[in-house]
């Protein structure tokens, strides 16, 4: 069988070049291209890297690597889940690799976790090539819906305790998930006291976008805060989240629920109650911009 070629791979190196981070590129050494297809919505590439395990790339942008995915998946999930007193019904928008689902079902209080992703190809290929992440799909509490998250949400009012939006960047199929009408849909789909997290880009590269995101969220939710995590294979090594609550008295910066240290170390490789608090502490330049 001939080797699979892809325009982002030259001389054995994958190059991630995007208008969203001009003048810089992330490169990973490729051991073998495992799969490439054009789905209905995006270009899907999966390759085995020499040092980061299998890598999922959508529209030429790294979504996850097996080496560092846990930082993102754990933080976007547990910042929301542990800011809610008793999350029983959880919705994941996007997240077709299954990583967020894997984290959601670590909480015994969860009775149902629904995932809605627009692209069946991401779900199908993650099950094939990212087994440690897609393990979440096999859990008995999980239901999967393939479709547009925006349209899916319109059918739900006062239904979910936590909604996690694990989207790609605001270009292509995920663009609408960064706009105010979407946050209103999230708000309306939550029960009283409900919490959301949503992927919210990078303080080094996207401060104007984050400033607008926070403003939009504040107009919809009484509580809206920006947190971030470190992750080596995302642009400039960080990614942020908006964490919002319908409860005006909520303090999402401090976990309402926490595991014992022993449980934490068993369940998580990145998240802990201390890092929950620390993730909201921003460097001066970002803090000033977001005030």
From Swiss-Prot:
Record: residues binding putrescine: 72, 166-169, 234
Reaction it catalyzes: S-adenosyl 3-(methylsulfanyl)propylamine + putrescine = S-methyl-5'-thioadenosine + spermidine + H(+)
Pathway per the UniProt entry: Amine and polyamine biosynthesis; spermidine biosynthesis; spermidine from putrescine: step 1/1
Any Pfam family: Spermine_synth
Ranges that cross the membrane: none
Keywords: Spermidine biosynthesis, Transferase
Transferase is among the record's keywords: yes
Catalytic residues of the enzyme: 166 (proton acceptor)
A GO biological process held by the record: pantothenate biosynthetic process
Domain PABS: 11-246
Oxidoreductase among keywords: no
EC number: 2.5.1.16
GO cellular component: cytosol
Top-rank taxon: Eukaryota
Catalytic class of the enzyme: transferase
GO molecular function, one term: spermidine synthase activity
PROSITE patterns: PABS_1 (PS01330), PABS_2 (PS51006)
Binding positions for S-adenosyl 3-(methylsulfanyl)propylamine per the UniProt entry: 42, 73, 97, 117, 148-149, 166
Stated family: Belongs to the spermidine/spermine synthase family.
NCBIfam families associated with the record: PRK00811.1, speE
Name used for this protein in its record: Spermidine synthase
């Amino acid at each position: 069988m001939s080797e699979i070629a892809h325009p982002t791979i030259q001389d054995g190196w994958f190059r991630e070049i995007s208008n969203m981070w001009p003048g810089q590129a992330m490169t990973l050494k490729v051991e073998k291209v495992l799969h490439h297809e054009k789905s209905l919505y995006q270009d899907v590439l999966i390759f085995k890297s020499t040092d980061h395990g299998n890598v999922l790339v959508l529209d030429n942008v790294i979504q996850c690597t097996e080496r560092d995915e846990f930082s993102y998946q754990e933080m976007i999930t547990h910042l929301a889940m542990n800011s809610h007193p008793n999350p029983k019904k959880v919705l994941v928008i996007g997240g077709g690799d299954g990583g967020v689902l894997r984290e959601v079902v670590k909480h015994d209080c969860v009775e149902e976790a629904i995932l809605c992703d627009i692209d069946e190809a991401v779900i199908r290929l993650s099950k094939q090539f990212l087994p440690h992440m897609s393990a979440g799909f096999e859990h008995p509490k999980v239901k999967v819906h393939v479709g547009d998250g925006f349209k899916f949400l319109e059918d739900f009012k006062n239904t979910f305790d936590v909604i996690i939006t694990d989207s790609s960047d605001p270009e292509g199929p995920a663009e609408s998930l960064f706009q105010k009408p979407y946050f209103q849909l999230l708000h309306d789909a939550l029960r009283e006291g409900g919490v959301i997290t949503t992927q919210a880009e990078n303080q080094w590269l996207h401060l104007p976008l984050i400033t607008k995101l926070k403003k939009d969220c504040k107009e919809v939710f009484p509580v809206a805060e920006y947190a971030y995590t470190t992750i080596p294979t995302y642009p400039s090594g960080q990614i942020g989240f908006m964490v919002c609550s319908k409860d005006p008295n909520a303090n999402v910066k401090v976990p309402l629920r926490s595991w014992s240290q022993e449980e934490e170390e068993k369940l998580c490789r990145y998240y802990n109650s201390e890092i929950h608090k620390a993730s909201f502490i921003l460097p001066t330049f970002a803090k000033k911009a977001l005030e």
